[in-house]
């Protein structure tokens, strides 16, 4: 599952900046606003779908999500054709529709997939499994980068069409092979309505957050990290294109971004492999220390990109930021699951995701406005500053564990 999702995502997103900027003509504010629409959708639906996964089935939730994601990405790839002669709906409106489908589909998968893995293999093995899954995902990303560059050179929207098809195929495959053997539904009154069952599950998840103060702090801090990384993730490609400028070589933009993404993925693969050897994924304090270090590296890389005077400096900053994200994802997932109960795992993970979505929804437009009002460089600088509170939180967590 992780391999196929990473392959589809890499195929679509490696050259997404070229498609959105050069083919669809979106400006910095619209680029961030489309992300805001996505995250607002996640904010609205994440709690509902997380409760569905904990109340009924993680497997069903994941499969539904795959088909919705496939539909959303196919729509996004079809915008060039949907806005042809005679169309009364604008390019940006179609992008908004596709982002809404993307958001709804992702909420069905988010939380449910990790909860399913942890329940099936057990908490003690989950950290190692998530690390191996990340390595497989990064390997798939390398394949997707090549596909994205090749498809984009044929026509810029083709990567999204192929990515949507891959998600639909994955949904069919999971219907056949995905099993759910360890999931236990929460007990409810026999005559309880679906709404009462889902409300009971959500309240149980909220109790878990209240009982773990540090988990509540993490949820609050994701507001800042969500706002920060939304701006960075949407704007680093346009920044290289118009803010720094690509080298004057006989190489297309698709190839440039393919090379950058491949290099970042290779760095991430090496970093994940080292993390598997050096980090005791069963030791919560060591996992927290690793998160502090990785967050420091990411913040430094984003700030470095904001002040980059030339292309070489900017590329090194982008590579370091990308590699730090690749390594931190499984480490962060492991840390969260160390503090969660099985019966409400998907619900609490969805709450964390909602907090991230709220941060992106509230802060993303501000970062985008800064880019339109002043410069993209100023947007990226503000994104780095917004991530600084995260460092204080992980430092506090480590002190609590000593």
Language model features with spans:
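Juxtamembrane intracellular "pre-TM" segments in multi-pass secondary transporters
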Residues: 179-219
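Hydrophobic core of transmembrane alpha-helices in multi-pass small-molecule transporters
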Residues: 3, 72, 86-109, 312-327
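C-terminal ends and interior cores of transmembrane alpha-helices
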Residues: 67-89, 296-309
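C-terminal transmembrane bundle of multi-pass solute transporters/carriers
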Residues: 1, 32-37, 43-44, 48-49, ...
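Cytoplasmic helix-loop-helix junction between adjacent transmembrane helices
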Residues: 98-138
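Glycine-rich segments within core transmembrane alpha-helices of 12-TM secondary carriers
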Residues: 130-149, 355-363
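Helix-loop junctions on the cytosolic side of multi-pass membrane transporters
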Residues: 163, 167-191, 396-402
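Helix-loop boundary and gating motifs at the non-cytosolic
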Residues: 1-43, 214-261
């Amino acid at each position: 599952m992780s391999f196929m999702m990473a392959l589809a995502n890499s195929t679509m997103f490696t050259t997404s900046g070229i498609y959105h900027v050069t083919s669809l003509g979106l400006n910095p504010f619209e680029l961030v606003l489309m992300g805001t629409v996505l995250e607002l959708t996640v904010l609205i639906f994440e709690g509902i779908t997380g409760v569905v996964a904990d109340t009924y089935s993680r497997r069903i939730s994941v499969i539904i999500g795959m088909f919705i994601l496939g539909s959303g990405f196919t729509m996004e790839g079809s915008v060039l054709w949907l806005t042809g002669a005679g169309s009364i709906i604008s390019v940006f409106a179609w992008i908004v529709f596709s982002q809404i489908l993307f958001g709804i589909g992702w909420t069905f998968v988010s939380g449910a997939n990790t909860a399913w893995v942890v329940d099936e293999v057990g908490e003690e093995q989950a950290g190692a499994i998530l690390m191996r899954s990340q390595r497989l995902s990064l390997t798939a990303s390398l394949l997707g980068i090549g596909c994205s560059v090749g498809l984009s050179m044929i026509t810029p929207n083709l990567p999204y069409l192929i990515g949507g098809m891959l998600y639909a195929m994955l949904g069919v495959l999971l219907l056949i092979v995905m099993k759910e053997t360890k999931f236990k539904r929460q007990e409810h009154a026999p005559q309880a309505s679906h709404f009462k069952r889902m409300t009971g599950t959500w309240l149980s998840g909220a109790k878990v957050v209240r009982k773990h103060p540090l988990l509540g702090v993490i949820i609050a801090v994701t507001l800042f990290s969500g706002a920060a990384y939304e701006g960075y993730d949407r704007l680093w490609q346009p920044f290289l294109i118009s803010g720094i400028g690509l080298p004057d070589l006989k190489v297309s933009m698709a190839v440039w971004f393919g090379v950058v993404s491949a290099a970042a993925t290779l760095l991430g693969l090496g970093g994940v492999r080292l993390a598997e050897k050096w980090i005791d994924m069963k030791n919560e304090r060591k996992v927290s220390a690793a998160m502090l270090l990785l967050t420091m590296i990411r913040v430094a890389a984003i700030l470095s990109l904001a002040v980059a005077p030339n292309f070489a400096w900017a590329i090194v900053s982008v590579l370091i930021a990308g590699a730090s994200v690749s390594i931190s994802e499984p480490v962060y997932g492991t840390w969260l699951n160390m503090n969660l109960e099985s019966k409400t795992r998907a619900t609490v993970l969805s709450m964390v995701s909602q907090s991230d979505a709220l941060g992106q929804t509230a802060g993303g437009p501000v970062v985008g406005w800064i880019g339109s009002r002043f410069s993209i460089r100023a947007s990226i600088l503000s994104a780095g500053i917004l991530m600084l509170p995260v460092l204080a939180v992980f430092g506090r967590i480590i002190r609590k564990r000593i």
